[in-house]
């Protein structure tokens, strides 16, 4: 895991990325390296790899980022490939209860970077779907699960 000063230097806009809300308990397991797969009911309509910014619920800050380099399908019974079950930090019953017999997705976490200085939501530009495509706009509240944002490329 790399640490860097996320607010240093200038920035420029990049490609589409994801802002993902994660509870403090799971953030700690991600930071420790124990949790390397984040389970979600949905996934972005883009192929890996893509950047994900971690919004830590409770403190209201973006604490870091990771590269989602693989998406693992979890079938409707909450079954996950055996080699992928442990890195979710979920018991089979928890996984089944969360997905409620629906299909889910395991987002693989790689290239984790935790910011020395957590960032505010207003520093990010959201992307919303319009009839003309994706349009940029301010983020006024955190996503319930995840949302598209513009990728920030920090210099310095």
Question: What are these model-predicted stretches?
Answer:
Residues 10-156:
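Structured alpha/beta reader/binder surfaces that contact nucleic acids or chromatin modification marks
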């Amino acid at each position: 895991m790399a640490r860097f000063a996320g607010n240093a230097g200038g920035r420029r806009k990049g490609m589409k990325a994801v802002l993902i809300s994660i509870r403090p308990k799971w953030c700690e397991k991600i930071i420790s390296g124990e949790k390397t797969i984040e389970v979600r009911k949905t996934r972005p309509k883009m192929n890996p790899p893509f950047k994900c910014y971690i919004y830590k619920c409770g403190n209201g800050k973006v604490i870091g980022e990771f590269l989602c380099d693989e998406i693992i399908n979890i079938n409707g019974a909450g079954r996950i490939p055996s080699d992928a079950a442990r890195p979710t930090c979920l018991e089979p019953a928890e996984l089944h209860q969360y997905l409620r017999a629906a299909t889910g997705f395991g987002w693989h976490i790689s290239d984790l970077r935790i910011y020395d200085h957590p960032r505010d939501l207003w520093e990010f530009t959201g992307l919303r779907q319009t009839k003309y495509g994706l349009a940029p706009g301010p983020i006024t509240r955190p996503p319930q699960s995840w949302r598209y944002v513009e990728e920030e490329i920090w210099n310095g």
